[in-house]
Regions:
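Ligand-recognition elements built from short beta-strands and adjacent flexible loops
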Residues: 105-116
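Active-site beta-strand/loop architecture of penicillin-binding DD-peptidases
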Residues: 1-5, 11-105
Length: 116
């Protein structure tokens, strides 16, 4: 059930989407080292939340793919994970599982099924 929507000019959405594309596909992007050679175009955002002086930050990473026609979205949060760029590989593994299932015409039995 859709609870609400954000109303904004289409160019604002496009700017955010392109920024997320650059995170994974530009040499300066914080997730580039994880996705530069990925066969499907990915859009992503890395993040970290400080926990106080002397504590390791919590890490977050979100992405969707394919960039131009999204089929799947992944969110990863790791307590004391330091930085989103350091956990991007976990999202890549989820995408690997998803796209290998898609290419082999297998299906997941139900929502919330853990892919192994």
């Amino acid at each position: 059930e859709l609870l609400s929507t954000v109303k904004s000019d289409e160019r604002n959405y496009k700017a955010v989407q392109y920024g997320m594309y650059l995170v994974a596909n530009s040499a300066n992007g914080t997730a580039y080292s994880t996705f530069y050679d990925y066969p499907v175009a990915v859009a992503a955002k890395t993040g970290s939340a400080q926990r106080g002086e002397g504590s390791t930050a919590n890490a977050s990473f979100v992405c969707y793919a394919p960039y131009d026609d999204p089929q799947v979205a992944v969110a990863v949060v790791v307590e004391k994970g330091a930085a989103g760029s350091s956990i991007a590989v976990l999202a890549r593994e989820v995408l690997d599982a998803y796209f290998s299932i898609q290419s082999s015409n297998e299906s997941v039995d139900s929502e919330m099924t853990l892919l192994q």
